[in-house]
């Protein structure tokens, strides 16, 4: 079993990297790939860089070069659903773009022409994440839609606009839809597991700086449990 894990920033990958045995590292086109072993499973850890272009380029390299069995995209996110708090974890049911608009040509808001409006996470991986989360009793774990855009969501007007477009949205961030889109094109199963570093629109820039490390700890904890339980 070959498992790929993608995080955008150093803070989002460093804990998992330290857990890998026999680790080797290489950089391709500015993307950092670390291969190693955790719980007798081969793991490819990708530090993709921030934003959709970086995520798409690095995920393409990952899938073409390493051909993993499945992909987990992890790291931090901004909470959107009213039930969520900083530190909570969101498991994706599906992933969408929140900054794509070709509705004038009768596409759904967020839909890239020629592709589905929503990239649906693999059911088995969602179940694996949910079952692994049962071992974590001090963090709320939710399941729902995650949306991606190339902007940090601290503008209340933008938050209100996205909330209107996606009323049941759980979290926002800057890479997952690009990762999911590439996985869709390659036919590779994926799931997104994100911990909340902030609540979108509510002094989110201050909260992000304060709670990024906590979010990374929580999301990595769940990812490690998922890898351990993978058959």
Swiss-Prot record:
A molecular-function term among this protein's GO annotations: methylthioadenosine nucleosidase activity
UniProt-listed Pfam families: PNP_UDP_1 (PF01048)
Superkingdom classification of source: Bacteria
Record bears the keyword Amino-acid biosynthesis: yes
Reaction(s) catalysed by this chain's protein: S-adenosyl-L-homocysteine + H2O = S-(5-deoxy-D-ribos-5-yl)-L-homocysteine + adenine; S-methyl-5'-thioadenosine + H2O = 5-(methylsulfanyl)-D-ribose + adenine; 5'-deoxyadenosine + H2O = 5-deoxy-D-ribose + adenine
Known role: Catalyzes the irreversible cleavage of the glycosidic bond in both 5'-methylthioadenosine (MTA) and S-adenosylhomocysteine (SAH/AdoHcy) to adenine and the corresponding thioribose, 5'-methylthioribose and S-ribosylhomocysteine, respectively. Also cleaves 5'-deoxyadenosine, a toxic by-product of radical S-adenosylmethionine (SAM) enzymes, into 5-deoxyribose and adenine.
Family, similarity comment: Belongs to the PNP/UDP phosphorylase family. MtnN subfamily.
Regions annotated as coiled coil: none
Pathway: Amino-acid biosynthesis; L-methionine biosynthesis via salvage pathway; S-methyl-5-thio-alpha-D-ribose 1-phosphate from S-methyl-5'-thioadenosine (hydrolase route): step 1/2
HAMAP family membership: Salvage_MtnN
EC number: 3.2.2.9
NCBIfam families per the UniProt record, alphabetical: MTA_SAH-Nsdase (TIGR01704), PRK05584.1 (NF004079)
Binding positions for substrate per the UniProt entry: 78, 153, 174-175
GO cellular component: cytosol
Catalytic residues of the enzyme: 12, 198
SUPFAM superfamilies on file: Purine and uridine phosphorylases
A biological process term (GO) from this entry: L-methionine salvage from S-adenosylmethionine
Designated name of the protein: 5'-methylthioadenosine/S-adenosylhomocysteine nucleosidase
Annotated keywords: Amino-acid biosynthesis, Hydrolase, Methionine biosynthesis
Keyword Amino-acid biosynthesis assigned: yes
């Amino acid at each position: 079993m070959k498992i790929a894990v993608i995080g955008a920033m150093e803070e989002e990958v460093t804990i998992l990297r330290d857990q890998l045995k026999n680790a080797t590292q290489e950089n391709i086109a500015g993307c950092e790939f670390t291969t190693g072993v955790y719980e007798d499973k081969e793991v490819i850890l990708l530090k993709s860089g921030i934003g959709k272009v970086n995520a798409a380029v690095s995920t393409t390299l990952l899938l073409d070069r390493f051909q993993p069995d499945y992909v987990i995209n992890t790291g931090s996110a901004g909470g959107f659903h009213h039930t969520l708090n900083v530190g909570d974890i969101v498991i994706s049911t599906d992933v969408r773009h929140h900054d794509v608009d070709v509705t004038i040509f009768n596409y759904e808001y967020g839909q890239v022409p020629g592709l589905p409006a929503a990239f649906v996470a693999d059911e088995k991986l969602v179940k694996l994440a949910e079952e692994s989360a049962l071992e974590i009793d001090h963090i709320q774990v939710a399941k729902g839609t995650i949306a991606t855009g190339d902007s940090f969501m601290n503008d209340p007007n933008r938050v209100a606009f996205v909330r209107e477009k996606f009323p049941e949205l759980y979290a926002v961030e800057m890479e997952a839809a690009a990762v999911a889109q590439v996985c869709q094109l390659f036919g590779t199963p994926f799931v997104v597991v994100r911990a909340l570093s902030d609540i979108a629109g509510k002094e989110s820039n201050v909260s992000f700086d304060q709670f990024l490390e906590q979010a990374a700890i929580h999301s990595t904890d769940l990812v490690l449990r998922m890898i351990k339980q993978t058959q």
